Amino acid sequence: APAAGFFGMR
């Protein structure tokens, strides 16, 4: 789930 990493960065 790459989306999780995106949200973590934001």
From Swiss-Prot:
GO terms for biological process: neuropeptide signaling pathway. Myoactive peptide. Increases the amplitude and frequency of spontaneous contractions and tonus of hindgut muscle. Keywords: Amidation, Neuropeptide, Secreted. The keyword Secreted applies. This is Tachykinin-related peptide 6. Brain. It is found in: Secreted. One of its GO terms (cellular component) is extracellular region. The modification Arginine amide is found at residue 10. Its main location: secreted.
